[in-house]
């Protein structure tokens, strides 16, 4: 029948139309392109990938595995950086504790009627000053020692620590002077039981040199014999040099430096009675120059009430008293400026010591 013949053949396809899979003959490409025909002797399988595509993918896989890129670890979270307030919190707490103790000493002195208690507190004053020494040690060493220990924050930390050190220094000086004004404390330097000065810290300026700081509670004559005349000291520094080869019977060598002032009417030749009512004080930093007795004469040292020495002025500051922090800063500049220069014959230590710390 005609109808049966019409259904026996396949329907004509429109241009670009793909026949269904079951209507394709073996070896016939889907798009009818003769260039993409199946090679002879190999049955066509529409589910297999094209050889050219497979080779391209294989080449890409080889390229990706032949030169693998190194794995770069992602930067982890930065460690938390302490703020200055957090860093200074335990330091300021200790400062408040020591200032509170100083206020207690002052309150008992001013408001207590118990004379025995006041005398006992005066005897406890040296112990209280010694209790402050470890705190001073930390403040000055952390602020000034070389190399710095706080990295980029060193300058900010240095300023804060030195302000705290100066605040406590002036408070202790005021407290000792107040007890001395009531007659409970002696400021005479010749008295071994007096509190003429107290320790304010220590720091290193090189690998073999350390500086210790002392503050006089009141201006004190430079020597007991009052020579040089009209010269009074307010601060003292010990420059201790450790020998390069310790353990061979060599002791540390110590130089002494002072913050002093000199009454200016001495230069005019006038006596204090004929001078102006307001006497100006010319401040300077100098070094102790020993005059005697000889270092190897032990008998002379025993009979000598006080060593003789002169004052070698190294820096003239002016008529305004420097703060304790500024005075120590100026001394450090003087000491570090001596690098590579010959020291005076009476000075201890090798020349050019500051270069050792560089």
Curated annotation (Swiss-Prot):
Q: Where is this region: Disordered?
A: 1-84
PANTHER family the record matches? UPF0575 PROTEIN C19ORF67
Which gene name belongs to this protein? C19orf67
One Pfam family name from the record? DUF3314
User: Which superkingdom?
Assistant: Eukaryota
Q: Which InterPro entries match?
A: DUF3314
Q: Which family does the UniProt entry place this protein in?
A: Belongs to the UPF0575 family.
- Please note every region of biased composition (Pro residues): 17-32, 70-80
What is the official name of this protein in its record? UPF0575 protein C19orf67
Q: Which organism is it from?
A: Homo sapiens
């Amino acid at each position: 029948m005609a109808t049966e013949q019409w259904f026996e053949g396949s329907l004509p396809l429109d241009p670009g139309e793909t026949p269904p899979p079951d209507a394709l003959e073996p070896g016939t490409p889907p798009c009818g392109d003769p260039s993409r025909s199946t090679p002879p002797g190999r049955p066509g399988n529409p589910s297999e990938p094209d050889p050219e595509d497979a080779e391209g993918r294989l080449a890409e896989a080889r390229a990706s595995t032949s030169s693998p890129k190194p794995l770069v670890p992602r930067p982890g979270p930065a460690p938390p950086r302490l703020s200055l307030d957090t860093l200074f919190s335990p330091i300021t707490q200790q400062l408040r504790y020591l200032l509170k103790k100083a206020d207690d000493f002052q309150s008992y002195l001013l408001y207590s009627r118990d004379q025995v208690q006041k005398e006992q507190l005066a005897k406890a004053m040296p112990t209280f000053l010694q209790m402050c020494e470890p705190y001073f040690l930390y403040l000055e060493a952390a602020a000034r020692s070389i190399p710095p220990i706080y990295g980029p924050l060193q300058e900010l930390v240095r300023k804060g620590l030195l302000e705290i050190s100066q605040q406590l220094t002036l408070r202790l000086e005021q407290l000792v002077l107040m007890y001395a004004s009531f007659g409970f404390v002696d400021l005479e330097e010749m008295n071994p039981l007096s509190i003429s000065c107290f320790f304010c810290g220590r720091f290193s300026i090189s690998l073999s040199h350390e500086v210790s700081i002392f503050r006089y509670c009141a201006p004190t004559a430079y020597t007991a014999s009052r020579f040089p005349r009209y010269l009074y000291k307010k601060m003292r520094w010990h420059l201790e040099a450790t020998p390069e080869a310790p353990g061979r019977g060599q002791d540390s060598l110590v130089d002494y430096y002072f913050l002093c002032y000199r009454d200016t009417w001495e230069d005019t030749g006038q006596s204090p009675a004929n001078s102006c009512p307001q006497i100006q004080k010319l401040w300077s930093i100098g070094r102790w120059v020993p005059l005697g007795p000889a270092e190897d004469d032990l008998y002379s040292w025993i009979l000598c009430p006080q060593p003789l020495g002169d004052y070698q002025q190294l820096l003239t500051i002016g008529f305004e008293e420097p703060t304790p922090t500024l005075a120590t800063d100026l001394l450090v500049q003087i000491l570090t400026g001596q690098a590579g220069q010959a020291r005076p014959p009476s000075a201890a230590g090798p020349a050019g010591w500051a270069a050792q710390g560089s």
